[in-house]
From Swiss-Prot:
Belongs to the FAM13 family. Residues 200-217, 282-294 have a biased composition (Low complexity). The modification Phosphoserine is found at residues 130, 258, 405-406. It comes from the Eukaryota. The gene is Fam13c. It comes from Mus musculus (Mouse). This is Protein FAM13C. Residues 98-111, 327-342, 415-446 have a biased composition (Basic and acidic residues). Residues 462-471 have a biased composition (Acidic residues). Keywords: Phosphoprotein. Residues 82-134, 192-238, 268-304, 327-352, 366-485 are annotated as: Disordered.
Length: 601
C-alpha cells in the first residue's frame, strides 16, 4: 500500500493526469453526463491498467491494518502532510499552510492531494486505501452521480473551499441563535425537530461510507445532499423561526397591546372592518371608529344630541348677553353688531351660535323625517294662517263698506280655499312641495296687500304735507307718495271706482292748492315751476346735510362710533325734514324727466 502511494507521488505524468482528470470531472458537472463518462472510461483504460486487481485486494481493510500503515510510514514532511490530508475533514487549510512553507518542493502534491482527499471526503472512502483506488473511486462516483442540486458541486479550488467553510460555520451559528430564540416560544416537539434538523448533516457524512465498491452511487447523493439540505433547512428554520416568533408575539388574531394603550384594548373603538379603506393606523383604528360609533348609535341618542346642542346654544347666548351688559355698563350704550364682531372672542361665540342653530335645525328635521311626523309643518301653517287674520280684519274695517271689491275678495278668498284644500301634511317634503305650488298665489296676495293700504292713508298725508313743521307726521311722507305717483293709470281708476274714500280727494286737492304747491299737486305744475322747486329743494338738502354731518362727527369724537337710531333723538326734527326733502327731490326729478320725454316724443 505504501509502495503504491509512493508510486503515485513519484510519477509526475500519472499525478498530473489524475489531477487533470479530477479537475475535468469537477468542471464538467454542468456538461452532458454521457460524454463525460465515456471520456473517463477511456482515460482509465490508458492510465490505470492494474486498478481492478488492486481494488479487489484492498476492498475491505480493517482498523488494525490502518494503524500498522500509520506506524510504518517514514518521517517525511510531504507524505505526513498527505496522510494527514487523507484523515482530516478539512484538508485544504492544512495544505495551504504546507504549500506556504514548501512551495518549491510540493507544488505537484498540492494539486494531487486536495483532489484525492476531496474525492475521498465526498465519496466516503477510508483513509488507509491506496491513492489509485481512491482516484478511481472518485472518478466512478462523479461519473455515476446524478445532478441533484447545483449547490452541491465539488469545487477543488482552495479559495472557494475556505469561503464555503466559513459559510457553513456562520450558518451553524445562526441556527444555534435561532434555536435559542425560538425555544421560549416553541413547544418541546418543535425544539426536538429543530435540533435534529441542525445536527443531521454531520452524521450523514460519517454514515455515508459504502461497504461495497460495486454500488458507489447510493452513498454519494446522501452525502452530497447534506450541505444543500443544511442550507435549505437553515433557510427554512430562519423563515419559520421568524414567522413563528412574530406569530407568538402578535398572538395570532389578538395582537398584544402596550399597557399605555389599555383604553383601546378589546374595545369598540378598535376598527376591525375589512372593508374600510387602507389608511394609517393612527387615523384608521383610533380616529375613524369614534365617528363611526357615533354615527352608528345616532338613531337612539338623537334626542340627547339635540338637548346637548340646545344647552350649547343657550350657553353661547348667555355669554353674548353678559358681554352686552358689561359693554353697556362701561360705555352707556348697547353694543352694535360692529362692536360685537370687533371682539374676536365674541365673534367666535356668534359663529358657533350660528353653526349650532343650523345643526339643531338639521337634526330636528332629520328626526322628524325618521319618526314620520313633522312638528314644524303645522306650526308653519299656523304661522302663515294667523298673521293674515288681523290684516283681513283691518281690511274689513277700512274697506268693509265697499260693495264692489270683487277682485280683492276673489284673490283673498282663493288663498283660504287653497289652504282648506291642502291640509297640513305630516311629511316635511310635502309641505315644501305645496309651498312651491302656492308660491305664485302668495306673491300675488302680498302685492295686493301692499297696494291696498295706500289709498286710505293718502288723505292724512295730504293734510300733513300742508303743515311742514310737523316732523313726526311728515316722517311717513317719503315712502308713501312715491308708489302713488308711480302707479299706472289703470290702478288709479280701480281705486277711484272701488273706494268711496277717493271722493274726498278733489276737495282736499282744492284746499291744498290755495296755500301753495305741495307734494300732491306738483304733477300739475309747469316746467319752470318744477325747476324752481328743484333748486330750492337741493339747497335745503345741502343745509340739512351739513348740520347732520356736524352732529355725527361730534358724536363720533365723543363715543368713537357712529350714532344709532336711539342716539338721533336730539336731532329727530332735522332727520325727519331731511327725509322729506329727499323724497320731494326724487319726485321733482321724476316729473321733470317725464315732461322732457313727452316733449321729445
Amino acid at each position: 500500500m505504501f509502495s503504491c502511494f509512493c508510486f503515485s507521488l513519484q510519477d509526475n505524468s500519472f499525478g498530473s493526469a489524475a489531477v487533470t482528470e479530477c479537475d475535468e470531472d469537477t468542471v464538467s458537472v454542468h456538461e452532458d453526463e454521457d460524454d463525460c463518462s465515456g471520456l473517463r472510461d477511456e482515460d482509465n483504460k490508458e492510465n490505470y491498467p492494474q486498478v481492478a486487481a488492486r481494488l479487489d485486494e484492498l476492498a475491505l481493510p480493517s482498523h488494525e491494518a490502518q494503524q500498522h500503515v500509520e506506524q510504518t510510514l517514514p518521517v517525511d514532511g510531504v507524505l505526513r502532510t498527505s496522510m494527514g490530508n487523507f484523515k482530516s475533514r478539512k484538508p485544504k487549510s492544512i495544505l495551504r499552510a504546507e504549500s506556504g512553507r514548501n512551495h518549491g518542493e510540493s507544488q505537484e502534491t498540492e494539486h494531487v492531494v486536495p483532489s484525492q482527499s476531496e474525492c475521498q471526503g465526498r465519496a466516503g472512502t477510508p483513509a488507509h486505501e491506496s491513492p489509485q483506488s481512491s482516484i478511481f473511486r472518485c472518478q466512478e462516483t462523479v461519473r455515476l452521480q446524478p445532478r441533484i442540486d447545483q449547490r452541491a458541486t465539488i469545487w477543488p479550488k482552495d479559495a472557494f473551499g475556505t469561503q464555503q467553510d466559513l459559510h457553513e460555520n456562520s450558518l451553524l451559528k445562526l441556527q444555534a441563535l435561532e434555536s435559542g430564540l425560538c425555544s421560549a416560544f416553541l413547544t418541546t416537539q418543535e425544539e426536538d425537530g429543530q435540533v435534529h434538523g441542525v445536527k443531521d448533516p454531520a452524521p450523514a457524512s460519517t454514515q455515508s461510507a459504502p461497504a461495497d465498491s460495486a454500488d458507489p452511487a447510493d452513498p454519494m447523493p446522501a452525502h452530497k445532499d447534506a450541505p444543500g439540505d443544511a442550507d435549505g433547512t437553515s433557510e427554512d428554520l430562519q423563515s419559520a423561526g421568524t414567522s413563528r416568533l412574530l406569530y407568538h408575539i402578535t398572538d395570532g388574531d389578538n395582537p398584544l397591546l402596550s399597557p399605555r394603550c389599555s383604553i383601546f384594548s378589546q374595545s369598540q373603538r378598535f376598527n376591525l372592518d375589512p372593508e374600510s379603506a387602507p389608511s394609517p393606523p393612527s387615523s384608521q383604528q383610533f380616529m375613524m371608529p369614534r365617528s363611526s360609533s357615533r354615527c352608528g348609535s345616532g338613531d337612539g341618542k338623537e334626542p340627547q344630541t339635540i338637548t346637548q346642542l340646545t344647552k350649547h346654544i343657550q350657553s353661547l347666548k348667555r355669554k353674548i348677553r353678559k358681554f352686552e351688559e358689561k359693554f353697556e355698563q362701561e360705555k352707556k350704550y348697547r353694543p352694535s353688531h360692529g362692536d360685537k364682531t370687533s371682539n374676536p372672542e365674541v365673534l367666535k361665540w356668534m359663529n358657533d351660535l350660528a353653526k349650532g342653530r343650523k345643526q339643531l335645525k338639521e337634526l330636528k328635521l332629520k328626526l322628524s323625517e325618521e319618526q314620520g311626523s313633522t312638528p314644524k309643518g303645522p306650526r308653519r301653517n299656523l304661522s302663515c294662517e294667523q298673521p293674515p287674520v288681523p290684516r283681513e280684519n283691518g281690511k274689513s274695517e277700512a274697506v268693509g263698506p265697499e260693495p264692489g271689491s270683487s277682485g280683492e275678495e276673489t284673490s283673498d278668498a282663493v288663498v283660504p280655499e287653497k289652504r282648506e284644500q291642502t291640509p297640513p301634511q305630516d311629511d316635511g317634503k310635502g309641505t315644501k312641495q305645496d309651498k312651491n305650488l302656492i308660491k305664485p298665489l302668495y306673491d300675488r296676495c302680498r302685492g295686493i296687500k301692499q297696494i291696498l293700504p295706500t289709498p286710505s292713508l293718502i288723505p292724512t298725508i295730504q293734510e300733513e304735507e300742508d303743515s311742514d313743521e310737523d316732523c313726526p307726521q311728515g316722517s311717513q311722507q317719503p315712502s308713501l307718495p312715491d308708489p302713488v305717483s308711480r302707479l299706472p293709470v289703470g290702478d288709479h281708476l280701480i281705486y277711484s271706482e272701488t273706494e268711496p274714500v277717493r271722493t274726498l280727494l278733489p276737495d282736499e286737492k282744492k284746499e291744498g292748492k290755495q296755500p301753495a304747491l305741495s307734494m300732491s299737486n306738483l304733477h300739475e305744475a309747469t316746467m319752470p315751476v318744477l325747476l324752481d322747486h328743484l333748486r330750492e329743494t337741493r339747497a335745503d338738502k345741502k343745509r340739512l346735510r351739513k348740520a347732520l354731518r356736524e352732529f355725527e362727527e361730534q358724536f363720533f369724537k365723543q363715543t368713537g362710533r357712529s350714532p344709532q337710531k336711539e342716539d338721533r333723538m336730539p336731532m329727530a326734527d332735522e332727520y325727519c325734514e331731511y327725509k322729506h326733502i329727499k323724497a320731494k327731490l326724487r319726485l321733482l326729478e321724476v316729473l321733470i324727466s317725464k315732461q322732457d320725454v313727452a316733449k321729445t316724443i
